[in-house]
Amino acid sequence: MTRLLWLFAAITASLAQDEISQDKWKLARANNYLGLNLLKQLPSNDKTNVFLSPFSVSTAMGMAYAGARGDTLEQLTLNFGYAADELNEGKVLALFKEQLQSTNDLPHDYTLNIANAAVAQEGYGILPEYTDALTSSFGAEYIEADFQKRGQEAIQKINAWVSNRTHGKVQSLFDEPPDFSTRLILLNAIYYKGTWLYEFDKTKTKPRSFYNGGVEKVQVPMMRLKSTLNHTYNAILNADLVDLPYVGNDFSMTIILPREKTGLASLKSVLTSQTLNLALQNMYPKDMKLKLPKFKLDTKYTLKPPLEAMGITKIFSADADLSGISGSRNLYVFDVLHKAVLEVNEEGSEAAAVTGFVIQLRTAAFVTPPPLPKVYVDHPFIFLIRNSKTNTIMFLGEINAL
């Protein structure tokens, strides 16, 4: 018989800040490492946009990580970027707890809701130590459902939870009941709605040219802003970076625009957590003009293939050791689902995302020329919504076509 565990995460874009411990930077680096690697692995082309929430995925993965043991735990520690900063399991869970607490203490300049839940098969023997870890480090609710006999009812309950926690932006994660052998579904939901600190004037939004794939000229609603914004040019990325802060200055959207209209692939090849952090450190205020298209994104991914390509394989195999969940080595992750939604307009941003794991029972150097007085986002670009203090990437995407 096969038993499944699904992990889901729902998120909406833009977070706020808190006093940062040195170790919290390490969790942010691990989050960004995972997110940027996923961006490179997800399928994209000149006509396809990409959007995901690294924060959502890493939180959902973190809840599975809490139940991993042995070589499965070792592989996750390495490929999540924890090993590079010498973070062990205890420290990782402590940092997730600190992150949750600090987020709950944020000011109310925007709407930010974060929730986690564990939906378990009725009567299945989840270890108390595991549920305690989910409650302590992730503030997770514990919910029981019957996936074997009342699968449709269970899925309605889960989809209602997802919709409620994302204010209806993500209305469902499952289109049909999961396999009857599902034993646990881990849910992470985050909803964010933020207002630009410097709003775009709606009367100045006009149809303007955008080059899909860097070559195909189309007309799109283009917003215009004249303001003092943080900006830098990075020679390694060969791109301009512009920061659009949200009210409260805790979160911002960073636009990464390659200088070449067809330069997105080259940009992605050199964009790492290290090159990104160095570029962000070199941003400074400048009076400038910005043109940015309005856009909406709605994406859904199966993350198992890209995660496996990143070296995360044991947790998906018959050799997985998730004995920290039930006390036995008969569970493995069947799949990881992720769904994300974003809208960017003159007022600000609203976003949400959902991530899911299924666990089954077996049977360089910088040169900074004078920055451009104008940044016109009229060709493919990368954007991210980040915590301005820790640089934690909450949402990440690339726009190829509008």
From Swiss-Prot:
Disruption phenotype: RNAi-mediated knockdown results in reduced feeding success rate in nymphs. Longer feeding time. Higher mortality in nymphs. No significant effect on Borrelia afzelii transmission from infected nymphs to mice. CDD domains: serpinJ_IRS-2-like. Induction: Induced by blood feeding. GO terms for molecular function: serine-type endopeptidase inhibitor activity; toxin activity. One of its GO terms (biological process) is immune system process. Residues 1-16 form the signal peptide. The keyword Signal applies. Interacts with host thrombin/F2. Interacts with host coagulation factor VII/F7 (activated). Interacts with host coagulation factor X/F10 (activated). Interacts with host coagulation factor XII/F12 (activated). Interacts with host coagulation factor IX/F9 (activated). Interacts with host plasmin/PLG. Interacts with host protein C/PROC (activated). Serine protease inhibitor that modulates blood feeding of ticks on vertebrate species. Inhibits the intrinsic and common pathways of blood coagulation in the host. Inhibits host thrombin, factor VIIa, factor Xa, factor XIa, factor XIIa, plasmin and activated protein C. Inhibits host trypsin and kallikrein. Reduces host complement activity. Does not affect proliferation of CD4+ T-cells and neutrophil migration. This is Iripin-8.
